[in-house]
């Protein structure tokens, strides 16, 4: 081989090495540039600074971690570290590593039917949440993740255009989910994954966080793979009081766990966000009438306003969601004496009424008030202390129907003629499931001429407290503790008579309370028997002789009762032998 060939080969090798080093430097530059861009995208989400390399390393090494509260998918909320979301696949991703945690580890039961509900509506098949699983090693084949540094609350809104759903299904559950978990606060960010646009009441959702809530569609602009450093998925349902009839006809939930105290605490928070100060010294009593402009109209509204003003000697004010700002409506309701409205979502604003106020709900012809009670249930929650009145139009000549409208507005022309005639002749809509029952829609979208004398009579016969006295101090019912130092002494007189002397001390908390009526309930049960003898007593000791037998063992339970309805816990059982 000649010297020129060797030199040429050496030159090629040197050039190749230089080019390779240049390419590696260029690749490294692009990687750094990409990481800077991903860091910038993360910074756009939040002011929290994030170390991108450290976050990526933690995701690869630790994978996703999940710990949930709740036994069933209907009451479960899950806390995640490094839960990811593919905006292309529209799937949440759980990355497995040796350090991953998944509690509960349900295996295939996670799909029966889901890990959890994304909304506060129980077990609705459009609201289920789950994730797909991948090994953390798969990250090398996927788009570089964009990390979300904010603590995230990931959920579905159920129907953001309906005010009842906004408050009952979304705002109240969000508010108390934030109270429930220490990591969540008003610096957390809300992520709405149901796919709706902002909706009519988006400004109300903004009160739940100091950061702009993000919609599912907006996530695509942030990156192809989003990873939430810390997130909570799902909502607490503890504040919900109503079920909408997806499985059985609608009605109050079987086990209501919220009271008016929690509702009013939330209402106070909302009023603060709306910059409304409650006027405790407002002297003038007035009635608010909710007016509707599209359907379910009160056709003699002006006449009704005048009659209410004359009958109750109060000013009457008309408001509507279309013509008044939400803050103006709440400001008026917060000092109102009475709210009158046709059945509809706007009645959820009754949660802003002062204690003692009257809620009058009007129902069109054929709609049984006992079958549709979300606002009655709200008004009568313990601690809400609202007076609720339901009035139904029972006169068919006072209703205006619209059979030619589209079906979703109560039209029935799409039905067979025989079915149309049956619906028109029907006197009452039978109980039904949600949400497209044509007879229900036909009747609920009627307009109504209110029989004013009938309505006033119903109000006066139902309202027991004098109107305008709502600003008195109201006391929340507090429950007694256990009675203390309970004792039992038995005595027998021969073989035919015996007595039990039972005594106890007052509950410890009674000495700090002013209670009008204090009673004690005593149960006496012969050991081995299923039945017992109950007694209600005013004193703290009593000698029982009726039905007490010698040479017999008795079990004795004692508890305190405040004001006839507030039942305390039973003290430890006493065992007494005669």
Swiss-Prot record:
Location of the protein in the cell: Endoplasmic reticulum membrane
Catalyzed reactions: 3-O-(alpha-D-mannosyl)-L-threonyl-[protein] + UDP-N-acetyl-alpha-D-glucosamine = 3-O-(N-acetyl-beta-D-glucosaminyl-(1->4)-alpha-D-mannosyl)-L-threonyl-[protein] + UDP + H(+)
Cross-referenced SUPFAM superfamilies: Fibronectin type III (SSF49265)
A Pfam match: Glyco_transf_61
Membrane-spanning ranges: 5-25
Cytoplasmic side of membrane: 1-4
Keywords, ordered alphabetically: Endoplasmic reticulum, Glycoprotein, Glycosyltransferase, Membrane, Signal-anchor, Transferase, Transmembrane, Transmembrane helix
Glycan-modified residues: 98, 275, 335, 451, 541, 563
PROSITE patterns: FN3 (PS50853)
GO terms classed as biological process: neuron migration; protein O-linked glycosylation; protein O-linked mannosylation
Cited InterPro entries: FN3_dom, FN3_sf, Glyco_transf_61_cat, Glycosyltransferase_61, Ig-like_fold
The protein's Enzyme Commission number: 2.4.1.312
Fibronectin type-III domain ranges (all copies): 484-578
Membrane topology: Single-pass type II membrane protein
GO cellular component: endoplasmic reticulum; endoplasmic reticulum membrane
Pathway field: Protein modification; protein glycosylation
Principal subcellular localization: endoplasmic reticulum
Lumenal compartment spans: 26-578
GO MF annotations, alphabetized: acetylglucosaminyltransferase activity; protein O-acetylglucosaminyltransferase activity
Protein purpose: O-linked mannose beta-1,4-N-acetylglucosaminyltransferase that transfers UDP-N-acetyl-D-glucosamine to the 4-position of the mannose to generate N-acetyl-D-glucosamine-beta-1,4-O-D-mannosylprotein. Involved in the biosynthesis of the phosphorylated O-mannosyl trisaccharide (N-acetylgalactosamine-beta-3-N-acetylglucosamine-beta-4-(phosphate-6-)mannose), a carbohydrate structure present in alpha-dystroglycan (DAG1), which is required for binding laminin G-like domain-containing extracellular proteins with high affinity.
Family membership noted in the UniProt record: Belongs to the glycosyltransferase 61 family.
Protein name in UniProt: Protein O-linked-mannose beta-1,4-N-acetylglucosaminyltransferase 2
